[in-house]
UniProtKB/Swiss-Prot annotation:
Quaternary structure annotation from Swiss-Prot or TrEMBL: Interacts with TusE.
Full protein name: tRNA-specific 2-thiouridylase MnmA
Family: Belongs to the MnmA/TRMU family.
EC number: 2.8.1.13
UniProt: ATP binding residues: 11-18, 37, 127
GO-annotated biological processes: tRNA wobble position uridine thiolation
Gene Ontology CC, one term: cytoplasm
């Protein structure tokens, strides 16, 4: 290894993607070390929390690859900058995306600073399925090569400066290739299933978890025609377009379409439902977004044509974006879209390039 080899700290989660990322960087000649972040303090004896197992897996991978593993506890930062905001959004009747907040506040802020200042890193690396490309002296965020696994939606808040300090080795690969590399290397994470759900809730019941921190306020479930047909246990447990867990059965005779949440009246604590997943009340012609983050950090003025995702794994929607002021934009879709949800993120693309995004403040309903 040459004296000038750049030092990279890989965020080791105990999963297959970060494991293979570390090996790929070794192959590319970097001086590689790992960092395991503990972001959540679980109660003793809670089986669902896999932090200890994840740390053991991360350590086993680092031992196998011959690299040092550092650990750091960001639980206080996580609580203050991610979790408190997550609860506040739910309390206001919106549906936040904590993974996006975690990337913004922890992985590409607290971790990036810790790696550079405390560990002397030139770069950090993560197992995200995204790519970076440097154009005109600025780093751009691109979709991952594996369109099925692309995670650019979760990283839209990053600036070109943060991307310039970050490496995404698996973004250039397809997921099956990543698993194959891990198997060939005999890594313990090769067959480990991908983590799902919100990191601090893990596999456990979301409703039960949320209820610990926010007491539910029961209220009426009303149809779009104004008929009361049931009771909800708290608006925060429901999101637009939701069908399961309403407790009102599919339909009266079982012949009609099932009920879907089409609106939340936060002021009166009423959940509004309608039948059919393409009910006009569920459709939006556009949205207003705020808290904007553009990757190039240039203020957006005027209008542009691009595509948008209003949730992860959604097909790109062609749209026109218009600046309303410094921090708000209006987005008009070419075709109406179902279940556009305030609190979630709208993320914009120009082909492979992720331009940035913002938080959906309100949806623009289909004119009745």
């Amino acid at each position: 290894m040459s004296e000038t080899a750049k030092k990279v700290i890989v965020g080791m989660s105990g999963g297959v993607d970060s494991s293979v990322s570390a090996w790929l960087l070794q192959q590319q000649g970097y001086q590689v070390e790992g960092l395991f972040m503990k972001n959540w303090e679980e109660d003793d004896g809670e089986e669902y929390c896999t932090a200890a197992a994840d740390l053991a897996d991360a350590q086993a991978v680092c031992d196998k690859l011959g690299i040092e593993l550092h650990t750091v506890n960001f639980a206080a930062e996580y609580w203050d900058n991610v979790f408190e905001l997550f609860l506040a959004e739910y309390k206001a009747g919106r549906t936040p995306n904590p993974d996006i907040l975690c990337n913004k506040e922890i992985k590409f802020k607290a971790f990036l600073e810790f790696a550079a200042e405390d560990l002397g890193a030139d770069y950090i690396a993560t197992g995200h399925y995204v790519r970076r490309a440097d154009v005109d002296g600025k780093s751009r965020l691109l979709r991952g090569l594996d369109s099925n696994k692309d995670q650019s939606y979760f990283l839209y808040t990053l600036s070109h400066e943060q991307i310039a300090q970050s490496l995404f080795p698996v973004g250039e690969l397809e997921k099956p290739q990543v698993r194959k590399i891990a198997e060939d290397l005999g890594l313990v994470t090769a067959k480990k299933k991908d983590s799902t759900g919100i990191c601090f809730i893990g596999e456990r019941k979301f409703r039960e978890f949320l209820g610990r921190y926010l007491p539910g306020q029961p209220g009426k479930i009303i149809t779009v025609d104004g008929d009361e047909i049931g009771e909800h246990q708290g608006l925060m447990y429901h999101t637009l377009g939701q069908r399961k867990g309403l407790g009102i059965g599919g339909t009266k005779e079982g012949t009609e379409e099932p009920w879907y949440v089409v609106d939340k009246d936060v002021e009166n604590n009423i959940l509004v439902v309608a039948q059919g997943h393409e009910h006009p009340r569920l459709m939006s012609v556009g949205l207003i977004a705020q808290q904007l983050h553009w990757v190039d950090r240039e203020p957006f003025t005027g209008t542009m044509r691009c595509t948008v995702k209003t949730r992860y794994r959604q097909t790109d929607i062609p749209c026109t974006v218009k600046a309303l002021d410094d921090d708000r934009i209006e987005v008009i879709f070419d075709e109406p879209v179902a279940a556009v949800t305030p609190g979630q993120s709208a993320v914009f693309y120009n082909g492979e390039v992720c331009l940035g995004g913002g938080i959906i403040e309100q949806r623009l309903p289909l004119p009745v």
